[in-house]
From Swiss-Prot:
Binding site for Mg(2+): 370-371
Gene transcribed to yield this protein: COX1
Name of the featured protein: Cytochrome c oxidase subunit 1
Subcellular location: Mitochondrion inner membrane
InterPro entries, per database record: Cyt_c_oxase-like_su1_dom, Cyt_c_oxase-like_su1_sf, Cyt_C_Oxase_1, Cyt_c_Oxase_su1_BS, Cyt_c_oxase_su1_dom, Cyt_c_oxidase_su1_bac
Biological function: Component of the cytochrome c oxidase, the last enzyme in the mitochondrial electron transport chain which drives oxidative phosphorylation. The respiratory chain contains 3 multisubunit complexes succinate dehydrogenase (complex II, CII), ubiquinol-cytochrome c oxidoreductase (cytochrome b-c1 complex, complex III, CIII) and cytochrome c oxidase (complex IV, CIV), that cooperate to transfer electrons derived from NADH and succinate to molecular oxygen, creating an electrochemical gradient over the inner membrane that drives transmembrane transport and the ATP synthase.
Cofactor binding notes: Binds 2 heme A groups non-covalently per subunit.
Subunit note: Component of the cytochrome c oxidase (complex IV, CIV), a multisubunit enzyme composed of a catalytic core of 3 subunits and several supernumerary subunits. The complex exists as a monomer or a dimer and forms supercomplexes (SCs) in the inner mitochondrial membrane with ubiquinol-cytochrome c oxidoreductase (cytochrome b-c1 complex, complex III, CIII).
Length: 524
């Protein structure tokens, strides 16, 4: 009973962070299962496993997207690593609002249940994660499926807003003595910028899907031209949230990668202030480029010119970050442990994803490539090999601190190489499919596309083997006896620890700091 009470009513940031990790792992496995079903259907031309049920295919795609974005990456990155390490890194005893932290987590399981139940009601919600009307309207999706998906989004949105309020308050008000803003670790900065993005963008999504809900159920016509509405308005509202959302997914990863590159190159991060301002710039610019998702809806030519230019400008702060990571490694004494492998893999693959993003920023090119597999390849390079590689990197980097035990290094490296090979084999051929004009969200295709699709599907099976390796690593690390206890500072940064988490025991005490740490060292 006491154990149940501890986990249900916990107000401890580490316990809640652990709950987020467990939740993210469960949702991630479910999302992976959906993605494998998608790739099995696309493994060869014709109907493979879904018996020609195109609606079911789109339900799988929608569920895969929602699970991976709202129930895997965000809970693990912001809820998991954020809750676990932001208070420790700034020298705070806990989060500012511990009970708010508890409900932020417990809103997510009901939200997940609503999403899964939407797939089981009538024909499911086959709208894609964008939920565009008129496809998501009551004429095209009668029944309760889309409404359940909307309520699911509302709940996870409220969870994220409450969490972001908590992080902003904690980082501004609960830093230890001497921890000025310009001494904040980069991961804390990344969570702060992410929290602001969430706070500003999610209410817009909430407004859009609430309008959609009333259109469906109460006969309003916000998005129905028959009553003077406009479905393009929904697209503007959705993407005003949706574009900052992709930066919400990747920014905490930037912070994690900065820590890892610095630690394993044995050097402080190159251009700390530049890194901070680059993240802030990405956050601001992220709100000014949303219509690049809408080049094909008939925007004015001047509007398209602006959004093309603005989108390309976002590449500048992103490039600053990438070159700063490379400069940090330059001349460093690099150790290729598992976290560093994932970090280098992240930098390499995220750069490829960024370059295809520059291609898609051109409105003229995008008109040809929009809604083809080129776009799928682009955002999976950014997310499936950006955000997810950052998650794995952070896991291997901090797992000793979380469990108090070291992970098996060889198995970790095997996990990296299998996953690296698998995801590249899955997503690189999609560029060729997209350039050949293969459209997204369609479960069948002409025979001409068969070769690359077969390769892509094979790659996804390899990725699953890699993920299975990962869970083997988790099982071995978390079980006692098979591996040695983790030192306070497993990466040998005792001589010059730049961040506070390496000064506390592994795992940290239930209350991390007996007294507040005073931060005296200036940043070199």
């Amino acid at each position: 009973m006491t154990n149940l009470v501890r986990w249900l009513f916990s107000t401890n940031h580490k316990d809640i962070g652990t709950l987020y990790f467990i939740f993210g792992a469960i949702a991630g496995v479910m999302g992976t299962c959906f993605s494998v079903l998608i790739r099995m259907e696309l493994a060869r031309p014709g109907d493979q496993i879904l018996g020609g049920n195109h609606q079911l295919y789109n339900v799988l795609i929608t569920a895969h997207a929602f699970l991976m974005i709202f129930f895997m990456v965000m809970p693990a990155m912001i809820g998991g690593f954020g809750n676990w390490f932001v208070p420790i890194l700034i020298g705070a005893p806990d989060m500012a609002f511990p009970r708010l932290n508890n409900i932020s987590f417990w809103l997510l399981p009901p939200s997940l249940l609503l999403l899964l139940s939407s797939a089981l009601v009538e024909v499911g919600s086959g709208t894609g994660w964008t939920v565009y009307p008129p496809l998501s309207g009551i004429t095209s999706h009668s029944g309760g499926a889309v409404d359940l998906a909307i309520f699911s989004l509302h709940l996870s949105g409220v969870s994220s807003i409450l969490g972001s309020i908590n992080f902003i308050t904690t980082i501004f008000n609960m830093r230890g003595p001497g921890m000025t803003m310009h001494r904040l670790p980069l991961f804390v900065w990344s969570v702060l910028v992410t929290a602001f993005l969430l706070l500003l963008s999610l209410p817009v999504l909430a407004g859009a899907i609430t309008m959609l809900l009333t259109d469906r159920n109460f006969n309003t016509t916000f998005f129905d031209p028959a009553g003077g509405g406009d479905p393009i308005l929904y697209q503007h509202l959705f993407w005003f949230f949706g574009h900052p959302e992709v930066y919400i997914l990747i920014l905490p990863g930037f912070g994690i990668i900065s820590h890892i590159v610095s630690t394993f190159s044995r050097k402080p991060v190159f251009g700390y202030l530049g890194m901070v301002y680059a993240m802030i710039s990405i956050g601001v610019l992220g709100f000014l480029v949303w219509a690049h998702h809408m080049f094909t809806v008939g925007l004015d030519v001047d509007t398209r010119a602006y959004f093309t230019a603005a989108t390309m400008i976002i590449a500048v702060p992103t490039g600053i970050k990438i070159f700063s990571w490379i400069a940090t490694m330059w001349g460093g004494s690099i150790q290729y442990k598992t976290p560093m492998l994932f970090a280098v893999g992240f930098i390499f693959l995220f750069t490829i994803g960024g370059l295809t993003g520059i291609v898609l920023a051109n409105s003229g090119l995008d008109i040809a490539l929009h809604d083809t597999y080129y776009v799928v390849a682009h955002f999976h390079y950014v997310l499936s090999m950006g955000a997810v590689f950052a998650l794995f990197a952070g896991f291997y980097y901090w797992v000793g601190k979380i469990f108090g035990r070291t992970y098996p290094e060889t198995l970790g490296q095997i996990h990296f190489w299998i996953t690296f090979f698998g995801v590249n084999l899955t997503f690189f051929p999609m560029h060729f499919l997209g350039l050949s004009g293969m459209p997204r969200r369609i479960p069948d295709y002409p025979d001409a596309y068969a070769g690359w699709n077969a390769l892509s599907s094979f790659g996804s099976y390899i990725s699953v083997v890699g993920i299975r390796r990962f869970f083997v690593v988790v099982a071995i690390t978390s079980s006692s006896g098979k591996n040695k206890r983790c030192a306070e500072s497993p990466w040998a940064v005792e001589q010059n620890p730049t961040t506070l988490e390496w000064l506390v025991q592994s795992p940290p005490a239930f209350h991390t700091f007996g007294e507040l740490p005073a931060i005296k060292e200036t940043k070199s």
